[in-house]
Amino acid sequence: MDSVIIEPDEREALASLVPAHPLPPRKTHSYVEQCEQKPHHPIRKYSLDEGSRSVTSDSEAVYFDSSDGEFSTEGVAIVDGRTSGERGNGEECGFVTPPSKPASQGGGNDGGREDDIESLPEFIGAGGGLDVFKVPVRAAVNPGRPPCLELRPHPLRETQTGKFLRNIACTESQLWAGQENGVRFWNLEEAYEVGCGLGGQVRRGDEDTAPFHESVPTSPALCLLVDHGNRLVWTGHKDGKIRAWKMNQPNTTTADDSKPFKERLSWQAHRGPVNYIVISSYGDMWSCSDGGVIKIWTLDSLEKSLVLKLEEKHMAALLVERSGIDLRSQVTVNGTCSISSSDVKFLLVDTVKAKVWAVQHLSFSLWDAQNKELLKVFNIDGQVENRVDMPPTQGQQVEDTKAKFFSAPKKEKSQGFLQRSRHAIMGAAGAVRRAATRSAGAFAEDTRKVEAIAIAADGSIWTGSMNGVIAQWDGNGSRLREVNHHQQAVLCFCTFGDRIYVGYSSGYIQVLDLGGKLIASWVSHNEPVIKLAAGGGFIFSLATHGGVRGWYVTSPGPLDSLIRTELSQKEMAYARQDSVKILIGTWNVGEGRASRGALVSWLGSAVSDVGIVAIGLQEVDMGAGFLAMSTAKETVGVEGSAVGQWWLDAIGNALDERNTFERMGSRQLAGLLISLWVRKSIRTHVGDLDVAAVPCGFGRAIGNKGGVGLRIRVYDRIMCFVNCHLAAHLEAVTRRNADFNHIYRSMVFSKGQSVYTAAAAGASTSAQALKNNPNTNNSTEEEKSHLASADLVAFFGDFNYRLFGITYDEARDFISHRSFDWLREKDQLRQEMNEGKVFQGMREALITFPPTYKFEKNKPGLGGYDSGEKKRIPAWCDRVIYRDNQSISYTECSLKCPVVSSTIMYEACMDVTESDHKPVRCKLHANIAHTDKSVRRQELGKIVKSNEKLRAMFEELKSVPETSVSTNNILLHSQDTFIFTIRNTSNSSRAIFNIVCKGQTLVREDGEEPDNHSRGTFGLPRWLEVSPGAGIIKPDASLQVKVHHEDSHNSEEFIDGIQQNSLSEESSDKEVTLIIIVQGSCSTRTISHSIKVRHCSSAAKSLSLVHSKTTTMTKNLEGSTRYQTDANRGGSTRHRTDDSTRRG
C-alpha cells in the first residue's frame, strides 16, 4: 500500500500539534485506495485540544456580545478620547480536524440523531487576524461598554408585527412605551424580575421582558408626554387623537395581572397624525401634525375635562376639542402664512425663557408660551425667514423630464446581438449612474434635516441632523456652534443633570458635556437608537428592533467595573447552549431547471437531521435583456423573477416546506439567488432575516457576477450566508480575489426590498447610500464590514477558481484514479487561501469528491466532462467555505466563543446531470452558546441589592447640593417686579434648578373660604412671569430670579378657537405657590423650596405677610417625603427690606 500523501503546508500544521496523550496507531492509505474502497470513508483525526493556540490575547482583543452589538465590530467605549487596544497580527493557514462530539450536545432541536458526529478535516486560510477578517471575540459581559439593565431584550422582528415600540418616556418610578397598538409601562421596582417565559401569557417576543402592563388596543402611539402635576401620561396617536393615561393604574400592582388598562381621556386633536405634544411653562398643551399645523389646548379646558367623571368622557372630549387654538390660522394674513406648510415633527419647551420651539426639517418657528405669539422664523443656518410658505418648485419635475428625453433610445443601424446586448447593459448602468448623480444634491440637503432637539440644563438648545452634526442654539434662536463626533444620523437626545446623551442611527450612544465636548461613547444596540429617556437612576434607550436597555447615570465610571466583574462571575447561572445542523447547497444551474428527482437527490436525502437549509443558485436566468431589466428593477427597489420563483417553489417542495420547513426569505440579483429555510421545530429561536446584494459585473454595476446574502439570528447569534458568482476564466485569479474582497467589505444588510435605495444597482440600503455619498466624511468605525461582526459566515457558490499547471488529460487521469490529493495541489483557491489573498481565516473541509465543472448536460458519470472543442480543464468551481468564532485552533463553545462549528458532510451529487455544474452540499454542525437574558437580569438585581460597595455608590447619587432661597413670600401689585436669589452653598457641586407652580388660590373679600385651584400641569398662571425658570448655579455662587406681574392676561377660555375672556378673577387677590426643584449634576433625588407669591388687585388691599421659615421638601427615588427647616442656613441673599411691602 502506498503511504498517505500530505501537502507541505498540511504536514507543517499537523507536525505542530502535540497531543497530551499518545495517539493510537494510525492506518495509512492513499487517497486513491481510500476512495476506491469507500468514497466517503472518514479519515482518522487528531485531537487539537492540547494544541490550541489563540491568535490574540484577551488583553488585546476588542470584546462585544453578538447578541448586543453584533452589527458593529467597534464596541469600544471612549472616555476622554482613549480607546481600547487593537488585536494581533494575521493568522497562518492550517489543516485541522475538530474533535468529534455528540449530536446531543446542547439543547437544540434540529431533528438530529443521538450518535456521535464525525467531523471532517478542514483547511484554514491564512490572514484571518488582519483587518476586517479578524475573528470577532465575544465575552459574557461586554467590557467595551457599560453594563446595562436589559429591560426588554431584543425581540425577533417577526414577533413584533403590528406592535413595535415607537418611543419611551420615564417618570420617577415607571417607564412608559408607545406601541403600534397602544401603550405599556414597567414599574421600575420590578425591573430586575424574571420574564414570564415561554409558558406565560405574554405574547411571543416578550418572554424575557421584565414584567409590564399593557393598555387596550389603540391607534399607533407616535409620542409620549409625562405630566407629573396631573400624574398622567399623554400620548399622541396616528389617528389624530390625544389620550391621557393615569400613572397609578388600578389593578396593576402585581405582575400577574394581565387585564389591559384604559385611557382617562381622549379627543380628536388633529385630522392627521399627532407628531409631538408638550406642555408649556404656562400649563397649556401644544400639539403638532402634518401640514405645518400647531394647536394649543389651554390649561383651563384640560383641567375642566379631567374633573369630569369617567361616565362623562364624551362630554370631556367635546370640551377639549372645542377649546383648541390653531396657531397657523392666527399667523395667516391675506392667505399668506408666516410658517411653512411642511410637517411639524417636534416641539420643544424652553422653560428658561418660557418659549416653545416648533421644528420642521429645515426650519424653526419660535413662539411666546405666555401670549402665544410668533416671535421668529429661521432656517437651520440661523437665518431669519420673512415668508416661508412658498409654492413648491418644479425643479425635480424638469429634471425627471430631462432624464426621460436623454434616456430615450435613438434609431441606429442594425447591430449584431453581442453589440446590442452590450449597449443594453451599459445603457442600464448609465441610467443608474444618472439617477445617482441627479439625486446627489437632494441627498445632501436631506442630510441636513433636523432629526432631534433637546434643551440642556443651562437653557441651551441642541439639535441633531442626519449628517451627524449637532448644533447649539441660545434661547433666542441664534446658532452658537456645531460639533460632529460621529458620522451617522442623530436620532434622539436626552438630558440629565449637566450631561447630554445622543442616540445615533449606528446604535451608538454618546455623552457630551454642556459645551459639546465628548465624554464617552459606546455601542448600545445593533440597530438605530430612536429614543432616550431619563428616570429612576437610568438613561433608557430604545432601538428600532424594540429592545430597551437602562444605562446607569454614572456610566461610564467605577460602578461599571464592579458590576461587570460580579456579573461575569455569575456566567454559569445564565449561560445556555444549543446546537443546530446547517445544510448549505450551491448549484450553478446554467439557466436550466431541475427535475424533482434531482432536487431530492441533492437536498431531500440530506435534511432529515438538519435545522437550517441555505441554498445558493447561480445563472438562474441570464442574457443581456434579463440583466438590463434586472438592473433597472434594482434601481426602484424591485428584485426577483418568475424563474427565480419557480426555483424557490421547487426547492420548497423538495424540502416539504408545508409540514417540516418554513421559508424565511430570499434575495435575487440577476442570475444569483439565495434562500433560507428553517425547521419548524426551532422556528421560535430563529428570525430577524436581513438581505443584501453586491454586484461585481461591468464596473460593479451589473449582477451577472457578484454576491447575494442573508443574515439571520439563531439562538441570539448572528449567522450570514453569502452566495457568490466570481469572475470566470483560468487567468482571472486576481479578479476573483478582488470580487470576494469587494463583496466582503461592501455587503450591507437591510430589512427587505422596501428599504433598497435607487441610487445604484448594488446599493443594498440607504445606509450604504449615506456611506458612499461623496459629501460625507466617513470615519473608520463606519467602514467596518457587516460580515466581520457575524458569529458564523458561510460563503458558497461558483467561485470559478480553476486547476493550474495541469493539462486536461492529466486532470482526467487523476480524477479517474480519484487522486484528489494531487489535484488539490493545483487548486487555485487553495493556493490563494494559503497565501492569505482570499477567504482569509476561513475554513473548507477536505475535498474528497471529483471536480464539479465542466460537464456536458444530461451525460452521466465521470465521462461527462467537457469533451468538446475547448476541453475545459475540470475544476472545483463550486465550493463552501465558512468561519465561526474560533481562531485557527479548536475552542470549546462558551460565551467567549459562542459559535463553534465543524463540517460533517461535504460532497457533490455526481448523478445530477441537468447542468454543466454538479450541485454541492455541505453540512455543518454548530454549537451555540447564548445568554438567558431574563436570568442574567435577575442576577444583576441580586448584585445591585447585595453588594455593599455598589449600595454605597448608589447612596452617593442621592446627595443634593445645599441651596438657600432669599425669601419665601412675595407680594406683588399691578406690573410689579420682584427679584429673589437662589444660592448654591456647596463648594464642589453645581446645582440645577427648575421652577414650577403648584397651585393658585383666590382670596375672597367677604371672608368666605378661599378658592383653591391646583395647577395640575405645574404651569404658571398667565398673570405671572418667572425668569429664568430653570438653570444651573455654580458652586458657591448665586443666581437672581425675576418675578413679574402682568395684568393684561385674564382667565382665558376658548370655544371653537374663539377666546372667551373672564374678568371675574380681577377683583380677587390671587396667591400661587412656586416650587423650586433642585438637584445635583448627577443626583437621583431632588430638594424643593417653596415660595408663596400673592398678587393684590389694588394698593389698598395690601396685607402684611408674616415672614415664615423656608420649608424644603426632599423627595427621594422611592417617593417618600421629609421636611426640614431652612431658617438657620447661611449664605442667604435678601433683595428686599420688608417682605410685605418691598416691590421690585
Curated annotation (Swiss-Prot):
WD repeat ranges, renumbered to this chain: 158-196, 216-255, 269-307, 445-483, 524-561
UniProt-listed InterPro entries: Beta-prop_IP5PC_F, Endo/exonu/phosph_ase_sf, Ig-like_IP5PC_F, IP5, IPPc, WD40/YVTN_repeat-like_dom_sf, WD40_rpt
Keyword Calcium part of the UniProt annotation: no
GO terms assigned for molecular function: inositol-1,4,5-trisphosphate 5-phosphatase activity; metal ion binding; phosphatidylinositol-3,4,5-trisphosphate 5-phosphatase activity; phosphatidylinositol-4,5-bisphosphate 5-phosphatase activity
Cross-linked residues, Glycyl lysine isopeptide (Lys-Gly) (interchain with G-Cter in ubiquitin): 949
Record function comment: Has phosphatase activity toward PtdIns(4,5)P2, PtdIns(3,4,5)P3 and Ins(1,4,5)P3.
Name this protein carries in UniProt: Type II inositol polyphosphate 5-phosphatase 14
